[in-house]
Amino acid sequence: MRSSAIIALLIVGLDAMGLGLIMPVLPTLLRELVPAEQVAGHYGALLSLYALMQVVFAPMLGQLSDSYGRRPVLLASLAGAAVDYTIMASAPVLWVLYIGRLVSGVTGATGAVAASTIADSTGEGSRARWFGYMGACYGAGMIAGPALGGMLGGISAHAPFIAAALLNGFAFLLACIFLKETHHSHGGTGKPVRIKPFVLLRLDDALRGLGALFAVFFIIQLIGQVPAALWVIYGEDRFQWNTATVGLSLAAFGATHAIFQAFVTGPLSSRLGERRTLLFGMAADGTGFVLLAFATQGWMVFPILLLLAAGGVGMPALQAMLSNNVSSNKQGALQGTLTSLTNLSSIAGPLGFTALYSATAGAWNGWVWIVGAILYLICLPILRRPFATSLVI
């Protein structure tokens, strides 16, 4: 069973690399299809369309994986991604580009189903470690992808999309050959599958008791959108960073997060337990946010990165807490819901935090980091509630 978890990790890394490959050149491709003044608007719309489709469809695909198994849904997701990138690589007109993003968003359950596969394949005591590995693989893919995409973009704006399609095709073959089904209690009932759309508005009965932890998950994902949306702008405004320094800081940010998630999450959760590991991560990240708000020199950011990376151990611990409180036949629904919440935060976070930054930067541009730290404090009363460590529903 652990072999399936390892294959799932490889697929997550390849999928993330495919996503990262296209980011540096998507604006360039858009310039071939629309006037220059419309590029930014369409770029944002394409990113939002993917995230919105994930909000709606990721929980549904997770439910399908509970009913029909992880393997067929994961294969469909990888095939959908390969088709999406192929369409985008050869898009002759703008609407075809939108169709490609729509297809990818609808079928893009790779992360959710991979997480369900890992939950199926690992015991409760080791899930935080494996979810940490998954976060590290995703981070490594998102570091390597943009770097490779930038190089391929020098050849052609279409080349990174072709490479992303090939990567997902390779992941598809990898899953076909090596991935074994890990959810063996599915199917065989003869009953029609009841798929619940808009699951965030109507949680499954088995997940409803975890509403408070879902709220914590969403808040933490929302906080993560502060650096995602404002790292470059803040570095340029506060420290007058140039492009090279911005790139170096982003590479260091991603690398330290991947290292901590891969090598610190497991030992720390084994020693402290998932709840205390989560609290440790929140404290480290919140402290890093406050220090960033008051940093006056660019070099100060780099030691602060260690605190932010330590904060990254909290999310795998929280994901393990949630997974340990759900039975095996609801892991897909759970992971799909978490993917939906993640994408919802990626829509709301940049809009809210960039608006806050614009409104407060004239007086002091550190407020957005203070607000992020305050949001962590909101989670503390919720986490004081007792939650079961293993609840089979």
From Swiss-Prot:
Q: Does the keyword Cell membrane apply?
A: yes
Q: Gene for this protein?
A: tetA
The UniProt similarity line reads: Belongs to the major facilitator superfamily. TCR/Tet family.
What is any one of the record's Gene Ontology cellular component terms? plasma membrane
Location(s) in or outside the cell: Cell inner membrane
Q: How does it sit in the membrane?
A: Multi-pass membrane protein
Originating species: Vibrio anguillarum
Q: Name one GO molecular function term.
A: antiporter activity
Instruction: Give the keywords, sorted.
Output: Antibiotic resistance, Antiport, Cell inner membrane, Cell membrane, Hydrogen ion transport, Ion transport, Membrane, Plasmid, Transmembrane, Transmembrane helix, Transport
Q: Name it.
A: Tetracycline resistance protein, class G
GO biological process annotation, one example: response to antibiotic
- Bilayer-crossing regions: 6-26, 44-64, 79-99, 102-122, 135-155, 159-179, 213-233, 244-264, 277-297, 298-318, 341-361, 363-383
Lineage summary? Bacteria, Pseudomonadati, Pseudomonadota, Gammaproteobacteria, Vibrionales
Matching Gene3D superfamilies, A to Z?
A: MFS general substrate transporter like domains (1.20.1250.20)
